[in-house]
Amino acid sequence: MIFPIRCFSCGNVISEVYDEYKTRLSNVESPEEILNDLGVTKYCCRRMFASHRLENGKELFDDIVEYR
């Protein structure tokens, strides 16, 4: 699905760092290190990144659009 703008639990804006997270993740950096550097410290916000499906640079939304 499309990455959410805000954390579902606390309401912090998390979408502003998603592009940086996605870029650095494709460069084979550790998700823990990336989130620490980006200042995402709350567990609920970190969960939003960890649970978002991202394989080979493609999101779930990209797969769904193919069958439209």
Swiss-Prot record:
Residues binding Zn(2+), per UniProt: C7, C10, C44, C45
Classification via SUPFAM superfamilies: RNA polymerase subunit RPB10
Sample GO molecular function, one term: DNA binding
Gene Ontology cellular component annotations, sorted alphabetically: cytoplasm; DNA-directed RNA polymerase complex
Catalytic reaction equation(s): RNA(n) + a ribonucleoside 5'-triphosphate = RNA(n+1) + diphosphate
Cofactors (names): Zn(2+)
A GO BP annotation: DNA-templated transcription
Keywords: Cytoplasm, DNA-directed RNA polymerase, Metal-binding, Nucleotidyltransferase, Transcription, Transferase, Zinc
Location of the protein in the cell: Cytoplasm
Entry note: cofactor: Binds 1 zinc ion.
Record's keyword annotation contains Cytoplasm: yes
Cited Pfam families: RNA_pol_N
EC number annotated for this UniProt entry: 2.7.7.6
Superkingdom to which the source organism belongs: Archaea
Enzyme class label: transferase
Subunit and partners: Part of the RNA polymerase complex.
Assigned protein family: Belongs to the archaeal Rpo10/eukaryotic RPB10 RNA polymerase subunit family.
Role of this protein: DNA-dependent RNA polymerase (RNAP) catalyzes the transcription of DNA into RNA using the four ribonucleoside triphosphates as substrates.
Protein name: DNA-directed RNA polymerase subunit Rpo10
Gene name tied to this protein: rpo10
